[in-house]
Structures are given as structure tokens and as C-alpha cells.
């Protein structure tokens, strides 16, 4: 993998995940929301529930499944960004959850990737700061 491929892999993973979620009936509200150093890859509605979605993409599972990379520290960062998004949004106080999409993708030509597997972990974790 050349030096640009990890970034490309992540970007393509987010594109693959957004399409996958839309096919499952999610409505994408925003992508790559940033609050200070914290980022949420995808914010989507699943019915009336706001879903804050972390996308983890790997080229193989040799270093573990992609979703295993969402550490407690990463969960805290996502939760902080989610709180900021909710404070700025007009959604009121909706039901919320944290989902993870894990993708194994293989490189194609032209900086594109093809998903070998896509797995959704709905309600994958809870806000670690809220006990």
C-alpha cells in the first residue's frame, strides 16, 4: 500500500458505508462533522433516531476486524462531537445511538476500492462519559 492509500481507503470506506446505509433505509444528514479535533464520519437518521456512525475500513482482517479499532478513547471523541452536533442542530432532543460500520475492502485501479464485506453494528457503544 503506498503512502496515499490509507487516506484513500478511509475515504472510499466512508463512501461505501454511506451507500450501504442508504440501502438500509438510513437518511444521511451530514458527513465528516468536525468539532475541534473530534470527527464523526456519518450522521444519519434511522427513522426518528439520530445515528452517529464511525466507519472503519481495512484492506484485510489480519490485524483484527475493523470495528475492533473503535477504542474507548475513540468512543469518547465521537461522543464529544455528537454532543456538539446536538447542541448546534435543530433536532431538539432526539433518540440517539452510536453505530459502527466495519468494512474490508480490496484496492482496484484509479484509487477505488471494492468492499469484500460490510457489517453494521447498530448501537455499538454508549457514551462512555455518561456512565
Swiss-Prot record:
| One Pfam short name | UPF0102
Q: Looking at the record's lineage, which domain of life comes first?
A: Bacteria
Task: Give GO terms: molecular function aspect only.
Answer: nucleic acid binding
Similarity remark: Belongs to the UPF0102 family.
**PANTHER family cross-referenced by the UniProt entry:** UPF0102 PROTEIN YRAN
Name of the protein in its database record = UPF0102 protein Cvib_0014
Q: Can you name the source organism?
A: Chlorobium phaeovibrioides (strain DSM 265 / 1930) (Prosthecochloris vibrioformis (strain DSM 265))
Native organism taxonomy? Bacteria, Pseudomonadati, Chlorobiota, Chlorobiia, Chlorobiales
Amino acid at each position: 500500500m503506498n503512502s496515499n492509500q490509507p487516506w484513500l481507503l478511509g475515504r472510499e470506506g466512508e463512501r461505501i458505508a454511506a451507500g450501504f446505509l442508504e440501502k438500509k433505509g438510513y437518511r444521511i444528514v451530514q458527513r465528516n462533522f468536525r468539532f475541534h479535533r473530534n470527527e464523526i464520519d456519518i450522521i444519519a437518521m434511522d427513522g426518528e433516531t439520530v445515528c452517529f456512525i464511525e466507519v472503519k475500513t481495512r484492506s484485510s482482517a489480519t490485524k483484527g476486524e475493523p470495528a475492533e479499532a473503535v477504542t474507548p478513547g475513540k468512543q469518547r471523541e465521537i461522543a464529544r462531537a455528537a454532543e456538539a452536533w446536538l447542541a448546534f442542530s435543530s433536532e431538539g432532543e432526539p433518540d440517539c445511538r452510536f453505530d459502527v460500520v466495519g468494512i474490508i475492502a480490496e484496492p482496484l485501479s484509479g484509487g477505488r476500492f471494492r468492499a469484500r464485506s460490510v457489517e453494521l453494528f447498530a448501537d455499538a457503544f454508549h457514551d462512555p462519559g455518561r456512565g
